[in-house]
Design a protein with these regions (language model features):
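N-terminal capping segment at the start of a domain
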Residues: 48-64, 215-217
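Glycine/aspartate-rich loop-and-adjacent alpha/beta segment that forms the canonical ThDP
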Residues: 30, 254, 258-319
């Protein structure tokens, strides 16, 4: 993990279908404070393998979806939900009072998020089999009107997640809630102007309980990001907008991801929002999907899915 050179030294860290949907539980009393998990790196790596199997099986079963970015972000989301974030699936409600919140801005990578939500206890794992099916709560882009626990915003219309995250972080500040807000964005998504309006706003309002992460895989649906719309010096850009910038070049190494998230947490509360620029590999874990943008939004066929599943250990049991 690299600290952007101009940064000061960091401080020391001291039912499946619509008829089965029920409204989110509204808590009438303050829940017990949520706590982060004590899962080991080995535990998290085993979960990653199963989540990647889920991604392949979901997109193959639906014959559509976005496997590439989902596979690349697996370590980040597994680390967040199974180790870092303070959250309690049994106390789910839309407010998330006294819990850390997460917003997925690049909603097309819903397969990895749905798998992580299910495997961490937000809804039954077997519901993953309904991905993109008619009347399923697990549509290609997450929505709130389906009533899926864990989902607090409809996403996939790119560029909006940072704005929502800022609003949630400011609400926590106003409510005296010291929990954090996390957001995830694609690097291609940074071509949306709303991202930079939000980035300027977050710094201007000193939203220092917010940790944004950019999935910096260098690829998007039409090709390499640098060929479609170059981002230039991305760390310098975020720095210029007033953010505390961390660069992690090994976004598919669980230990490095955990270290980056821990460092980011240690920098919160210091007057600036924090961004992690996380270098990942699209299609990580499946040999023929890596190193190309072509699996951004293409589902594997029967033969391709079988080949992928041979490379991914079943560790928690397939749905």
């Amino acid at each position: 993990m690299k600290r952007y050179p101009q940064d000061p030294a960091p401080p020391k860290a001291s039912g499946y279908f619509r008829e089965r949907i029920t409204p989110p539980r509204m808590l009438m009393t303050k829940p017990a404070p949520a706590k982060a998990s004590s899962a080991s790196t080995e535990d998290l790596q085993r979960i990653c393998s199963q989540v990647r199997r889920d991604i392949i099986r979901m997109t193959h079963g639906a014959a559509s979806g976005h496997p590439g970015g989902s596979l690349g972000c697996t370590e980040y989301l597994v680390a967040l939900y199974f180790k870092v974030m303070a959250h309690d699936p049994s106390a789910w409600d839309m407010d998330g009072r006294d819990q850390d919140l997460f917003f997925l801005s690049n909603g097309h990578i819903s397969p990895v998020w749905y798998s992580v939500l299910a495997r961490s206890g937000y809804f039954p794992v077997k519901e993953l089999a309904t991905f993109r099916k008619l009347d399923s709560r697990l549509q290609g882009h997450p929505t709130t009107h389906e009533g899926l626990p864990g989902v607090r915003m409809a996403s996939g219309s790119l560029g909006q997640g940072l704005s929502v995250g800022i609003g949630a972080a400011l609400a926590k500040r106003l409510n005296g809630d010291d929990r954090l807000v996390y957001t995830l964005h694609g690097d291609g998504e940074l071509q949306e102007g709303q991202v930079w309006e939000a980035a300027m706003s977050a710094a201007g309002h000193r939203v220092d309980n917010l940790i944004a992460t950019v999935d910096w895989n260098g690829r998007q649906i039409d090709g390499d990001v640098d060929d479609v719309m170059p981002l230039g010096d991305l760390p310098a850009k975020w720095k210029a907008f007033g953010w505390d910038v961390l660069v992690e070049d090994h976004g598919n190494d669980m230990d490095r991801v955990l270290a980056a998230l821990a460092e980011a947490k240690s920098r919160t509360g210091k007057g600036r929002p924090v961004v992690i620029l996380l270098r990942t590999e699209m299609g990580q874990g499946v040999d023929y999907m890596m190193g190309t943008h072509k699996w951004h939004g293409v589902a594997p066929n029967d033969e391709q899915a079988a080949r992928a599943l041979e490379q991914l250990e079943e560790t928690l049991g397939d749905y």
